[in-house]
Amino acid sequence: MMTSLQLETSLPAVEEQVQREKDNDSAEDSHTASTTPTRIPHPAVARFRRSASLRLRGNPAELGLRAEHCPAGGGGFSSRAKLTAIPSSLETRSHPVHLRRNRSWCNLGHKTEQEPEVEASTEALCNAAQCLSLDKEALAPKVGNSSMANGKPRNLSLQLNGGSDISSSGTSSSSSNNKESSPRTTRTPRTPQTPQTPQTPASGVAASVAETPHSCIRQGNCVKANQVKLSTLHESKISPRTPPVTPDSPSTYLDDDIDSMYSFATTTSGRSTMSCEHPYVARNGTTFSGRKMKYVVHCSNYAGQVGPDYLTPTQRAQRQIRRLKELLCIARQDLEQKDTELLRLTREVVELRLFKASLSSPEERSASSDAVTVREAELKTSQDVSPIVDMVDEGNAKGSPRHLSRQQQQQANHSLQAMQMSAEMQSSYADSGHFEDLTMSSVHSKDSQTQSEACGTATPDGEADVGCGAGGDSASNLENYELQRQELISMYEHRIEELIRSQDSATSDLKRSHNDKVEALLQKLAECNTRYSDMVPDYEQAKQRIRELEKQLEDLQRKLIEHEEKQNKMYLHMYQQGQEAERISRADQALDLAQRQPESKVSINELLHQLQSTQDELENIRASECRMRECGSNHALLTAKEAISLWVLGARKTIYRRLLEAQKNRTHVDPEVTLQFLKSAIFYFLTDKENSQGHLQAIESILEFTDAEKQKISAANRTPK
């Protein structure tokens, strides 16, 4: 950040030299006009303006080396520079260092060395300093030099500027460096050089100081101590770009410049080097503000920003304007939406009022369609009646006067934005922050004009504000709106009446159809009841029949069980009889055998064979008994084979027993047993066809047939019948 103190000097001693330069105006006219805006307004053609820029850069050692070149005292560091004639020994340097003005924000802290183009620039600087009578080299203390040399490096730029640089930089190297460091700032042309004037001895100034003792912190730089009148007012010509100032004193800007320098000198010890101590600050965002509406030096809040983040006051103001315009557009859109909603709600209210009026009797309606008296006691509930609310037609909304006014507003906004974009493009060269130096017009006047145009495009109602004929258009729009409103009211009233009539007819038809359906359903229900009453006795009879059949089933099951038991008993009795008959027959055979061969004896082999056959039959009987146990629950009958095997077994046992008894007492024969045995053999011979041959042999043995008779019987059985 760079602090600039600008001071323009105009001395009577120099005016004579200004008159001498009028002959050379045509040759140097191109160099006198400054195209770059400056902070302090100046006349269009200034004959004598001197700019002294003292920049202290680097370290204390460098300041110590330059102490002899800065006779102002304090080691070349003071709040106001005192410029005297440079000794002749310094004029012969091959590379003298000249200080030039650098307005770029990027070159802060850099020292610019240039080759002098004209030797007269140094002389002009020295003569101007001599005319100011600020030579206090003899009175300056040497202690300040050492103290400043031992201090920290400073970054100070004191500019006593009337709009031009001290050293004219016209070479290509200096211009290229200036362009690289400040691409957005144009180069300031050089100031026409002033020929050397007679030097004013410094002893006169010292004598005047001695005569009027004065002491302050500014030491020899104080204006009161020097008693030199410094005027910053341009006495030659006033430029149209010069802003209005308060004519308090001839030295209008001097007090503020002195305050700025004083604030810098008093705050270097405890605060930042570039801070400001002004009792007033900028009010409108520009440098043209202050206690007396003068040019002051103040610290900007955006000074620390560099690169793309930095915005000039013009850019900040334009960004603020764009943001406000966006907010204005958003507010207008919200207003349009609210207007549309208001129109829709108005129509709904009208429709509801008409619908409410239609529900009352015709004699209670009033003549006006807007105000309708309704008998509240006869209104139906919300379940019986539903209000008719139709949506607003889009075509009517687009044809409304508000929609037309919105279209006009949008067109005006587009044209206004185009004008503002063109104005921003034209004023882009003024991004240095000097609002008052714009070539077109003042920023404040342009902002006020833009604001008036933006405010003129819309009224508080959101309708277009037209300059010429606005009253007539508004009246016609209101009349059209009222006509449309009346037409809508009449149309909706007619529609509501038609809907009510159609609804009544539809309701009556629906009731009739529903009554017919209800009667048909009631008739069907009666028929169903009759059928049900007829079917109930049948159902009871069927249930009784089912109970009777269940009883009969139980009786039949009991009878079946009894019959099976009887049959089993009969089979068992027949089996027992068969066993007894077999026993008798075996006994008879054994008896016959014993009678025929009394002397023969039964061999052991025959007995063993009979015993084996008997054991086999016993095994069969055991198996049959097991099957009988398994089937005993079902009361199953024995088969014929099982009965015969059991009978044969029993008969053999009986025969064996009787054989043994016959052997014991051969004389005893039981005819009853023989008869019973014969009876059983004949019965089974006739009934059991499968074992008929065995039964036949038993009969033959019981009846004691001979072998010839047995052969004839067997032959007769083999012949087919």
UniProtKB/Swiss-Prot annotation:
Sequence segments annotated as region (Disordered): 1-42, 143-210, 360-379, 393-428, 441-471
Tissue: Expressed in the third antennal segment and the maxillary palp, with increased expression near the cuticle of both olfactory organs. Also detected in the second antenna segment. In the brain, expressed in the central nervous system, with high levels of expression in the visual system including the retina and optic lobe, and uniform expression in the cortex. Detected in the thorax and abdomen, with increased expression in the ventral ganglion. In males, detected in the reproductive tract including the ejaculatory bulb and testis.
GO annotation, biological process: courtship behavior; male courtship behavior; mating behavior, sex discrimination
Keyword Repressor belongs to the record: no
Disruption phenotype: Adult males appear unable to discriminate between males and females when choosing a mate; either because they display increased levels of courtship behavior towards males (when presented with only males) or they display the same levels of courtship towards both males and females (when presented with both sexes). During male-female courtship, they also begin courting virgin females earlier than wild-type males, suggesting that their increased tendency to court both sexes may also be due to an increase in male sexual activity.
Miscellaneous notes: The name 'quick-to-court' derives from mutant males being quick to initiate courtship of both females and males.
Protein name: Protein quick-to-court
Biological source species: Drosophila melanogaster
Gene: qtc
